[in-house]
């Protein structure tokens, strides 16, 4: 593919299971006019983001004549076009998602219930699944109840008890079916599909999800199969002539959800340390990747007879591992288990008294999430000891907590556009008369609130719609607010999909697959109408308004009267550089004094703006943005 773009952009993609086949063609269309700097996504969007980042690295290698270890036609965006064509071929996605041993019936039931089938078919599938999942237990219960009825009342009693016995046997079968599914899920790491199938190679004429993804990432990036693509490979990739300065050539970010900690986490982990068990990872990843990670980790930590290997993080983290952690659709695709220290002990040969003295609690040393978290397992002490016990930390689909992370690469002012692709289903929400692929073309478009109708013909359907709307609100409220805000909405293209397109529809027809892929191409081409000048100006107006209002609030917070006497010493800490803070001390006297001067400047500027103006918010874009100090993840 001939490419001579001079512009750069970022790209963020939403989760959407099989709807993700929109993304490769969108990236290919964008690549005609732009070169990628930062790429991010969640769930299915993470798969597309990883593939796009790998293709971007491969393209750089081809353009810069660097060595590649793959056939040239499989590397870069030429290879991404081939991968996109494969995804759009009938049956390909279905082959990628293959159930683990013993999970076939439950897998088919989940796909049927979550897919676009009629209520009658779903009901029949649900009722019939009990007999298919637990046939022996159901029949044994029926036989036992029939035998009991015969023993008590003979043939007449057995006939009379036939219907009650069948109902009781069926209900018992429900219990056994649920227990069997629960055991299968736990055995397969909380999912019906692990993504690999090393125990059943004869049944897999094609590669399943994770094996295919590994081969695809290696091919697109031009790396050999035995050397997994890492985030460091992206960061240190070849640079184009005249490329704008940045710390990293290509940045890839994804979102996963830490179920055990109940929070979203960005990938790759750049400071947090986790461990993994080889047996668990061999069930999720290709052996060549696990072997590489074990070698990279070095000597394991052995606790209670189990070996724990340090998970490569930062530049060393394989892109495949991060992608797999983001795409673990709950119950369908296995979650990823990692481990963190639950308790630590002094290293052998250390002096207990000196160790205790050296590791006294010090909040000032907790500069990362890791330090603060591990303080909980060490009694607030610094990390000077080996893990004595581990606890499991489950990571699942990033879409659980952040399904459309359009904020991933935002800065105070943009250096280049960060585009985003949103997947919507207009038949279930009020989107007006928008075209199938919609990008706001002026500031009057894209601001309307999302509306999800609840009313249904039957009470059961309406109750279900109400419950699902609650779940969707918990999952998407922040993303929806951002997507309609000025500075965001003009850079988001919305792709409308019908109920037959994407989702858990694993058996889409050739025509449907072609239609979805075509929408992807249209989405990428839509950004040709994007005005960076208008976007940059809006972002500056947002920043000026928010900074002024925040600075005025700082002045107002300092000036309130009368002040609470008991809190006067606390107020003085920020103003008086000679006072002694209770924690998080500055590293030097100069830093402390500069911070105090900064506060005085902010107060002075806030008082001036509050009294004299001018008001930078009066004609600013609406709804108004706000500055808040919030934790990163």
From Swiss-Prot:
A molecular function (GO) term: hydrolase activity
GO cellular component term of the entry, any: plasma membrane
Active site per UniProt: 43, 397
Span list, region Disordered: 342-380, 605-624
Biased composition (Acidic residues): 352-365
Localization (cell): Cell membrane
Motif (GXSXG): 41-45
Any one biological process term the GO annotation gives: lipid catabolic process
Transmembrane segments: 38-58, 133-153, 159-179
PROSITE patterns: PNPLA
Chief place of localization: membrane
Motif (DGA/G): 397-399
Function in brief: This protein is non-essential for R.meliloti growth, but induces a heat-shock response in temperature-sensitive E.coli K165 by elevating levels of sigma 32 (mechanism unknown).
Protein's name in the database: RpoH suppressor
Organism listed in the record: Rhizobium meliloti (strain 1021) (Ensifer meliloti)
Name of the gene: suhR
């Amino acid at each position: 593919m001939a490419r001579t773009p001079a512009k750069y952009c970022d790209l963020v993609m939403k989760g959407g299971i099989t709807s993700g086949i929109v993304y490769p063609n969108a990236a290919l269309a964008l690549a005609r006019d732009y070169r990628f700097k930062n790429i991010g996504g969640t769930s299915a969007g993470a798969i597309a983001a990883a593939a796009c980042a790998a293709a971007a690295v491969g393209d750089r290698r081809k353009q810069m004549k660097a060595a590649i270890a793959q056939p040239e036609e499989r590397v870069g965006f030429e290879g991404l076009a081939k991968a996109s064509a494969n995804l759009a071929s009938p049956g390909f996605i279905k082959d990628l998602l293959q159930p683990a041993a013993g999970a076939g019936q439950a897998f088919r039931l989940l796909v049927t219930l979550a897919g676009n089938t009629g209520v009658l078919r779903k009901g029949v599938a649900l009722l019939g699944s009990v007999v298919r999942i637990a046939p022996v237990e159901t029949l044994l219960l029926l036989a036992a109840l029939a035998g009991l009825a015969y023993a008590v009342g003979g043939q007449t009693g057995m006939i009379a008890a036939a219907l009650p016995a069948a109902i009781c046997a069926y209900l018992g079968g429900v219990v056994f079916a649920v227990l069997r599914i629960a055991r299968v899920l736990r055995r397969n790491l909380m999912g019906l599909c692990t993504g690999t199938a090393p125990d059943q190679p004869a049944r897999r004429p094609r590669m399943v999800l994770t094996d295919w993804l590994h081969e695809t990432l290696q091919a697109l990036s031009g790396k050999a199969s035995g050397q997994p693509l890492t985030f460091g490979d992206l960061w240190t990739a070849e640079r184009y002539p005249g490329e704008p300065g940045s710390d990293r050539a290509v940045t890839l970010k994804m979102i996963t959800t830490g179920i055990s900690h109940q929070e979203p986490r960005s990938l790759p982990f750049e400071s947090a340390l986790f461990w993994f068990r080889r047996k668990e990872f061999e069930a999720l990843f290709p052996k060549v990747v696990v072997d590489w990670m074990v070698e990279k980790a070095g000597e394991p930590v052995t606790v209670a007879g189990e070996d724990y290997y340090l998970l490569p993080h930062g530049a060393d983290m394989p892109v495949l591992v991060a992608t797999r952690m983001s795409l673990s659709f709950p119950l369908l695709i296995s979650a990823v288990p990692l481990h963190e220290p639950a308790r630590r002990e002094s290293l052998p040969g250390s002096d207990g008294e000196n160790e205790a003295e050296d590791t006294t609690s010090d909040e000032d040393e907790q500069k990362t999430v890791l330090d603060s978290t591990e303080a909980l397992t060490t009694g607030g002490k610094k990390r000077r000891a080996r893990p004595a016990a581990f606890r499991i930390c489950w990571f699942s689909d990033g879409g659980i907590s952040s399904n459309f992370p359009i904020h991933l690469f935002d800065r105070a002012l943009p250096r280049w556009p960060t585009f985003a692709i949103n997947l919507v289903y207009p038949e279930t929400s009020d989107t007006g008369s928008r075209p199938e692929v919609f990008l706001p073309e002026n500031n009057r478009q894209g601001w309307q609130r999302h509306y999800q109708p609840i009313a249904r013909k039957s009470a059961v359907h309406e109750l279900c719609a109400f419950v699902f709307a609650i779940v969707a609100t918990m999952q998407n409220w922040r993303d929806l607010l951002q997507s309609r805000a000025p500075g965001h909405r003009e850079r988001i293209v919305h792709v409308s999909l019908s109920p037959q397109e994407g989702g858990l529809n694993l058996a889409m027809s050739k025509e449907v697959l072609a239609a979805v892929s075509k929408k992807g191409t249209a989405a990428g081409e839509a950004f040709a109408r994007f005005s960076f000048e208008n976007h940059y100006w809006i972002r500056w107006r947002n920043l000026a308004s928010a900074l002024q209002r925040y600075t005025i609030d700082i002045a107002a917070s300092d000036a309130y009267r009368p002040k609470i006497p008991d809190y006067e010493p606390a107020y003085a800490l920020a103003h008086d550089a000679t006072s002694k803070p209770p924690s998080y001390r500055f590293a030097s006297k100069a830093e402390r004094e500069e911070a105090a001067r900064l506060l005085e400047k902010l107060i002075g500027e806030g008082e001036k703006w509050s009294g004299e103006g001018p008001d930078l918010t009066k004609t600013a874009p609406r709804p108004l943005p706000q500055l808040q100090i919030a934790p990163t993840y």
